[in-house]
């Protein structure tokens, strides 16, 4: 009788059990390569499925183990030495969908080597287009889109990257296709991220779903634009897009980073040298003092701990309320005005900032920005009210300076004579009050300034100097 090797038999039984467990859980192996357009392998490229990470080896190859039911894509973080993949001007080609029915998926990527390194580029940040129906989509197409195209044309000597900060639509999954078409071929590479209105309201978010095969909130977005958490590199900047909405279904959600989101970010940043510039793009803000707990991501401190070693600009939307903050010495948040303003009700946000978007110019380590109001000159940086126009400040000239921060100086002149600094105050913006037909909503902005002219004054001039030394002037006759 042949002697039985119990150790080998036990090992084989355990292995068979593990393989069956892997198959039952939907696990698959993803293999692939990253090569340039000449067929040369690209090493050191970061590859992820949204949870697990690897890098390509010297031959440009990688391997990832994943569960495609839970992580339906594999994607790369494009290195700075290569062009950003796109299709008709919309970011594409950096991700691939997995076949959950296969035990092994092959996902290969092709990148185009830049002819020379990028030192200067333009970054355009667009928040909350939030189109709900054809009427709002038409306003976006006829107001915002031509303005974006005009701005891109004026900056055509630079490479331009665009980022939609979420709420691309307003729960209307059928508008993803026309939205994508609207932002195509604008003279930039246009990326997107998810807002609370970009989930399919019939389902919970992936992390809350026990059976993703039955449907999950991100599904339509994934099919239209790719992953929710991803990154890429351009110039000296590492750009990250993240989801900070935890969706419960049926329009219920919490502004927060899930533990899975933060773990993904920690791993992504592990490939970025400390001290580098990071652009983090999210939907809900992390430090807006006006909306506070009513709109900020709840666990922002955990985020800040990961970001502190870097020079960070956070770009956010969600509030329809413009506010700049410095939540940490190396972290500056731009919670910008919405492209739709106050939900396409008119032409201003709840703080009085006009509908528009932020134009960021990057040169090496230098980052500058200016808000671009839709349909207005790039020099239109504040709104001036005559005495009597601002209901609560009838005797004052009032300036609303939407991109204001603590480095600004705001001076005023009466009949050509310098009178000094205007007085900061907080209140609801009059343009917004007028737009909602006099109904006050309690959203008091901090970027208002006032000055009381003499009774016999003939003119008042306001001079605003921003943190970059740029000067904007407006004069009114009394």
Per-segment meaning from a language model:
Residues 45-49, 73-74, 410-412:
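Hydrophobic beta-strand segments
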Residues 331-404, 408-415, 446-477:
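Binuclear metal-dependent phosphoesterase catalytic core
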Residues 28-51, 68:
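Short, ordered, surface-exposed loop/turn motifs in non-cytosolic proteins
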Residues 51-67, 423, 429-430:
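Short, acidic Ser/Thr/Gly-rich low-complexity loop/linker segments typical of extracellular
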Residues 269-290:
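Short acidic, glycine-rich surface-loop motifs adjacent to enzyme active sites
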Residues 29, 81-176, 456:
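N-terminal active-site segment of His-dependent metallophosphoesterases
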Residues 188, 428-451:
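Aromatic sugar-binding surface patches on proteins
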Residues 80-87, 93-97, 173-274, 294-315, ...:
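Extended active-site neighborhood of metal-dependent phosphoesterases/phosphodiesterases
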């Amino acid at each position: 009788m042949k002697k039985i090797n119990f150790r080998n038999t036990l090992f084989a039984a355990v292995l068979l059990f593990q393989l069956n467990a892997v198959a039952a859980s939907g696990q698959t192996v993803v293999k692939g390569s990253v090569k340039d357009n000449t067929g040369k392998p690209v090493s050191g490229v970061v590859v992820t499925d949204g949870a697990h990470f690897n890098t390509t080896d010297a031959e440009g190859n990688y391997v990832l183990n994943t569960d495609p039911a839970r992580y339906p894509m594999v994607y790369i973080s494009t290195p700075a030495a290569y062009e950003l993949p796109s299709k008709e001007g919309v970011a594409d080609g950096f991700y691939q969908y997995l076949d959950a029915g296969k035990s092994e998926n092959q996902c290969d990527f092709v990148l185009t080597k830049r002819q020379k390194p990028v030192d200067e580029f333009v970054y355009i940040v667009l928040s909350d287009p939030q189109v709900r129906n054809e009427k709002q989509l038409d306003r976006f197409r006829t107001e915002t889109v031509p303005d974006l195209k005009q701005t891109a044309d004026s900056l055509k000597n630079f490479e331009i990257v665009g980022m939609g900060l979420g709420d691309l639509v307003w729960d209307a999954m059928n508008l993803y296709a026309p939205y994508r078409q609207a932002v195509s071929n604008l003279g930039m590479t246009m990326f997107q991220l998810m807002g609370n209105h970009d989930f399919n309201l019939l389902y919970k978010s992936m992390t809350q779903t026990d059976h993703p095969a039955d449907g999950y909130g991100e599904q339509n977005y994934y099919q239209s634009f790719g992953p929710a958490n991803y990154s890429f590199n351009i110039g000296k900047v590492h750009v990250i897009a993240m989801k900070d909405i935890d969706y419960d279904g049926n329009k219920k959600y919490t502004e927060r980073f899930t533990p899975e989101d933060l773990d993904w970010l920690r791993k992504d940043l592990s490939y970025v040298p400390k001290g580098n510039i990071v652009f983090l793009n999210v939907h809900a803000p992390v430090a807006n003092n006006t909306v506070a707990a009513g709109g900020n991501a709840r666990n922002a401190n955990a985020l800040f701990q990961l970001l502190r070693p870097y020079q960070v600009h956070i770009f956010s939307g969600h509030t329809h309320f413009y506010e700049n903050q410095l939540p940490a010495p190396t972290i500056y948040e731009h919670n910008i005005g919405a492209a739709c303003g106050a939900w396409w009700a008119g032409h201003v946000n709840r703080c009085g900032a006009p509908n528009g978007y932020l134009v960021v110019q990057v040169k090496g380590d230098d980052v500058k920005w200016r808000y671009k109001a839709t349909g207005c000159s790039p020099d239109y940086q504040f709104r001036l009210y005559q005495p009597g126009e601002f209901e609560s400040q009838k005797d004052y000239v009032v300036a609303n300076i939407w991109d204001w921060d603590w480095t600004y100086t705001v001076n005023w002149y009466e009949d050509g004579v310098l009178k000094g600094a205007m007085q900061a105050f907080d209140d609801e913006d009059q343009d917004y009050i007028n737009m909602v037909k006099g109904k006050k909503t309690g959203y008091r902005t901090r970027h208002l300034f006032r000055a009381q002219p003499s009774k016999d004054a003939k003119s008042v001039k306001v001079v605003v100097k921003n943190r970059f030394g740029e000067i904007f002037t407006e004069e009114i006759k009394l």
